[in-house]
Amino acid sequence: MKLPGKIAIMGGGSWATAIAKMCLAQEDSINWYMRRDDRIADFKRLGHNPAYLTGVKFDTKRISFSSNINDVVKESDTLIFVTPSPYLKAHMKKLKTKIKDKFIITAIKGIVPDDNVIVSEYFTKEYGVPPENIAVLAGPCHAEEVALERLSYLTIACPDKDKARIFARRLGSSFIKTSVSDDVSGIEYSSVLKNVYAIAAGICSGLKYGDNFQAVLISNAIQEMNRFLNTVHPLNRNVDESVYLGDLLVTGYSNFSRNRTFGTMIGKGYSVKSAQIEMEMIAEGYYGTKCIKEINKHHHVNMPILDAVYNILYERISPMIEIKLLTDSFR
């Protein structure tokens, strides 16, 4: 397998757009799968994504667009998946081309709903992609700041760290610093959990809890994350590293965080449906909450923050009541 070969971006949202910008800082050209032909036409005409990160300009002559997933896969060696996890299976149903000989990078910060599996496991289980040919791209990195070329740090995790290093070099730039890891499962689970905890932080903000309590919440969240990771995927990891703690902090505190925004709306009294409609963007943590809750039924890890968010979102228990109970459990 020649790496990276031809790279394809699989998705058309803000994070996909930011990753395309990162790739084109190093690559001569890329392939790009978007499901909507009208978006592709507008992109070519305007020179930017018409719906997301509209300030990022592209030389469209360096991009081969297509709404046909099979054509893109056939013409590519490395596939970077950036579709929201709730829609991944729908996209993949259109795929007739085998991908087991491709290199897969998942930048999806979610779990496949209903299956309750992390994305790397999904590609191995459903499509026969060997684990050593799957990498995870994660870290405290908002798409909006990549667009502004603000210094950001990303981690590429793969069981084969030599392959991870190849992509770390190709994705790095003057504004993107990269590191490598082999903790694929741990990083994927932490990427899901930090969205859940960002919703919790948003709910508390909507309820007018202050910065002092937010600090306590996040401190307890990283402990809860560590307990879960050590139970589900035991490994000698340091959760203080930026790909774990850093990603949790930026997602929990930043105004760019859609999960925090979603939680804030819930804390202010919005229903789940009304918050989702008004946001017009996917808050992955909503789906991740239910998935982790189901997974934890097999492990019985003490996760009071996850339980509180689940009760608020899915059991429709008052945020005020749930968060008050949560405050009594913190130290």
Please annotate each region the language model reported.
Residues 1-56, 63-67:
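NAD(P)+-binding Rossmann beta1-loop-alpha1 motif at the extreme N-terminus of oxidoreductases
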Residues 56-65, 129-133, 174-176, 301:
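A short helix-to-beta-strand connector/capping loop
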Residues 66-74, 78-151, 167-169:
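Rossmann-like NAD(P)(H) cofactor-binding subdomain of soluble oxidoreductases
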